[in-house]
Design a protein with these regions (language model features):
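C-terminal amphipathic alpha-helical interaction region
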Residues: 455-502
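Residue-level recognition of beta-strand microenvironments
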Residues: 16, 63-66, 78, 86-89
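P-loop NTPase catalytic core
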Residues: 139-140, 146-469
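Conserved beta-strand residues within beta-sheet cores
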Residues: 2, 7-10, 41, 45, ...
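N-terminal accessory targeting/assembly segments
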Residues: 1-23, 27-30
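Conserved hydrophobic positions within beta-strands
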Residues: 13, 59, 83-87
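Glycine-rich, histidine-containing beta strand-loop boundary motifs that form or position
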Residues: 5, 17, 25, 58, ...
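P-loop NTPase nucleotide-binding/switch module
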Residues: 24-65, 71-76, 92-147, 162-165, ...
Length: 502
């Protein structure tokens, strides 16, 4: 199977075979797919003249669209030489040949086999953090551009909502959202919200930078099985154009179930829990297509892959989850108890990890945030100590605990409620910049340090627990998405109030 790569992908909704669904009357129904991409005419402007020498990946021209992202037309990966002919500026259909290079016709839309990774010149080792707009991820479990992450979690823990928030607000040029085997109403909500929301960086609708591959649970087996490959192939295409792309797959467990069903129909011998024996190889091949690269044309682009995993009954030892955790560099494990306590995002700070954190800390220090690593370590340590002391307090009672330990428990509550919790429905808190996240974390840690010094000076823990810390907890919604100054003012006011107790 090959995917048609060219203008018309951005803002579109497709099935797993990359057939457009956007203009169907009821696009989630397995009915007529509506008009196809080649029916539209695109404005093409040539960048080279006939007779010029070009290599694979070089730009032949540019297609301008109504959105914020221009689409360069590149020399195919296996073609190089002189430009025999090239069309002038004008509007052309997607299947129109706009140039001929060494006897090879180059149309606006070029096919590519979805199971074959697109080539690149080199991989970039330098780590650059991908801001997601979610504080718990950007503070504790960062993901690098070109990295991989898994989001394992049981039913009702908020996987889809977290992935939708990342799709809306992460700092990427293009988002490829793959809904594989999900409920139709969830896919409809994603498409509608992307149409309604505005990208604060470009001023265009978020849908203008998004490609949605919608495969609901009632769609054919082959569409579900191929949707993952189609989506990552589209992502590699935009990477080759020089863009930073994020692929969100929700969920890889449904894709693995399609593999299991297909393998069963072929009569193959099943492996653990009925999955095919090559499940691990298939997952590895998918996640290995992520990367931060130098393209054939010398541009820089990246594909970051974030995949949800839906283990049955929350069993993290089942094959899909176990194999996925072997191949990803970050895991954001969702905790059922946090979700039931209405703590969202329900990312468990004790069960998640990021192998990119150390390299991200070095890069953040070079970029002007030298305290990033120290801040992350302190937040993680306070949360771990607070969890341990909270469990002990349930046995002996809070008042039986020493004042110094009660202050640590207070600091853990400030971090949980004032920093890590985030409302996806709030206009000012749904997205959070790295500067505001750092200001909130620094404010909570500063208040904790002041409370510790007050306890050492003789102030009892009952007095400190009676202080109203509501302004800090409310600061995450009162301050704008990028308003760190308001958080700093609230911190200073709270520190002054605590100073009156000494």
């Amino acid at each position: 199977m090959s995917a048609p790569l060219g203008p018309g992908l951005l803002g579109g909704v497709f099935d797993g075979l990359l057939r457009p669904l956007s203009e169907a009357g009821t696009w989630l129904a397995p009915a007529t797919t509506g008009h196809t991409v080649p029916d539209h005419r695109w404005d093409f402007t040539p960048s080279v003249r006939a007779g010029a020498d070009v290599d694979a990946g070089d730009e032949l021209g540019v297609v301008t669209t109504d959105g914020p992202i221009p689409i360069p037309i590149l020399v195919p990966a296996d073609v190089a030489g002189g430009v025999d002919s090239i069309r002038g500026r004008g509007a052309y259909r997607a299947d129109t040949v706009v140039a001929t290079v060494s006897g090879t016709a180059v149309p606006l839309t070029q096919p590519w086999p979805v199971r074959r990774p697109r080539p690149s010149r080199d991989r970039i080792d330098d780590v650059e953090m991908l801001p997601t707009g979610q504080r718990v991820l950007d503070l504790l479990f960062p993901i690098a551009r070109g990295g991989t992450a898994a989001v394992p979690g049981g039913f009702g823990t908020g996987k889809t909502m977290l992935l939708q928030q990342i799709a809306k607000w992460c700092e990427a040029d293009v988002i490829v959202y793959i809904g594989c085997g999900e409920r139709g109403n969830e896919m409809a909500d994603v498409v509608q919200e992307l149409q309604d929301l505005v990208d604060p960086r470009t001023g265009h609708r978020l849908a203008a930078r998004t490609v949605v591959v919608a495969n609901t649970s009632n769609m054919p087996l082959m569409a579900r099985e191929s949707s993952i490959y189609s989506g990552v192939t589209v992502a590699e295409y935009f990477r080759d154009l020089g863009y930073h792309v994020v692929v969100i797959a929700d969920s890889t467990s449904r894709w693995a179930e399609a593999l299991r069903e297909f393998s069963s129909r072929l009569g193959e011998l099943p492996a653990e829990e009925g999955y095919p024996a090559d499940l691990a190889s298939a997952l590895a091949a998918f996640y290995e297509r992520a990367g931060h690269v130098v393209t054939l044309g010398g541009r820089r682009g990246s594909v970051t892959i974030i995949g949800a995993v839906s283990p049955s009954g929350g069993d993290m030892t089942e094959p899909v989850t176990a194999h996925t955790l072997r191949f990803v560099r970050s895991a954001w494990s969702l905790d059922r108890e946090l979700a039931y306590a209405r703590h969202y995002p329900a990312v468990a700070w004790s069960g998640s990890f990021s192998t990119d954190a150390q390299a991200v800390g070095l890069r953040r220090a070079r970029d002007g945030d030298p305290d990033w690593t120290r801040r992350r370590a302190r937040v993680a340590a306070v949360l771990a100590d607070a969890d341990r002391l909270d469990a002990l307090a349930e046995l002996v009672g809070r008042r039986a605990m020493p004042d110094a330990e009660r202050v640590v428990m207070l600091g853990g509550r400030l971090l949980r409620e004032g920093v890590l919790q985030q409302s996806a429905l709030s206009p000012s808190d749904g997205f959070c910049s790295t500067a505001k996240a750092a200001a909130l974390a620094d404010a909570a840690l500063a208040l904790l340090d002041r409370c510790r010094s007050l306890v050492e000076a003789g102030v009892d823990a009952d007095t400190l627990e009676g202080v109203d810390f509501g302004p800090l907890i409310q600061a995450r919604e009162q301050a704008g998405p990028d308003d760190a100054a308001t958080v700093d003012r609230i911190r200073d006011a709270m520190l002054a109030r605590l100073g009156e107790l000494s």
